[in-house]
A protein has these predicted regions:
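Bacterial N-terminal signal peptides
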Residues: 2-9
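Carbohydrate-interacting regions of secretory-pathway proteins
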Residues: 12-254
């Protein structure tokens, strides 16, 4: 009798087990559909949703970081070359989170040593005139010793790069950066810190690094509230030959 009941119950048990088995459709997500972005035709070329900050033609997207007058660096032969006497320049637009691509070249005949050799910087958020903000260091890193938290690829005086991927002076180099801006409470206190991931010549040098605040030449970093900021390029005061930039674009992120 018991055996017969077991035989009769078996199909019911199997049916229940099959009903309880997860289905692949239960974990499929169909909405929202990501926007279509057309990649650039070549590596480093701006995708279809990029804001081109320098295309080799003019400085329309840039202003003086000191007084917000039109930028006065040198545009020639498709390049944007630092005019050191005119100071730093920054974007007219302000950004929060973004993906940035920038290419730069230190002259082949560069002179100087250490911090005085091909020095510049990409400030991922400019918080005032001069060097106020959050700097990703630009410097000749090819056989040019300096303090390692100020070498090329560093978050200046906060984070040593994972590796030195520098090319020789005279060769074009690139940064690809993902910037997550800090968020502040209504009273100006920090809610969430800034983070940066950076690739230097295609090599990871900063991996989701949490910044301690603004980058400073002297003193300890600190946060000062802001809501959106320009991207700034540095005209460093060293005496070495000026460097050039090209192909600068940004993609705003959520």
């Amino acid at each position: 009798m018991m055996a017969a009941m077991a035989v009769l119950a078996a199909p019911v048990v199997r049916a229940q087990q099959q009903a309880q088995q997860p289905k692949p459709e239960e974990t499929e997500v169909w909405q929202p559909v990501p926007a279509v972005v057309t990649p650039g035709e070549t590596p480093g070329a701006p995708p279809s949703d990029a804001i081109v900050l320098f295309d080799g033609k003019n400085e329309d997207e840039w202003i003086s970081a000191q007084d917000h007058t039109p930028a006065k660096w040198i545009v020639a032969d498709g390049l944007l070359t630092v005019a050191k006497s005119t100071g730093n320049i920054e974007t007219r637009r302000h950004f929060h989170n973004y993906q940035l691509h920038v290419e730069w070249r230190i002259p082949a005949d560069i002179t100087g040593t250490g911090q005085g050799r091909g020095n510049s910087g990409v400030f991922l958020a400019s918080t005032g005139p001069g060097d106020a903000g959050y700097e990703l260091q630009v410097l000749d890193g090819y056989n040019n010793p300096t303090y390692v938290n100020g070498m090329v690829g560093s978050i200046y005086k906060q984070s040593i790069p994972l590796v030195n991927a520098a090319r020789k002076p005279g060769e074009w180099q690139s940064y690809d950066v993902v910037w997550t801006a800090p968020v502040f409470n209504a009273d100006g206190s920090l809610k969430t810190p800034a983070y940066v991931t950076a690739f230097y010549n295609g090599v990871l040098v900063q991996n989701h690094f949490e910044l301690k605040g603004q980058t400073l030449y002297v003193g300890k970093p600190f946060y000062k509230a802001f809501d959106g900021a320009a991207i700034k390029l540095q005209a460093h005061g060293d005496k070495s030959e000026p460097m050039s930039f090209r192909n600068i674009w940004v993609r705003e992120l959520p």
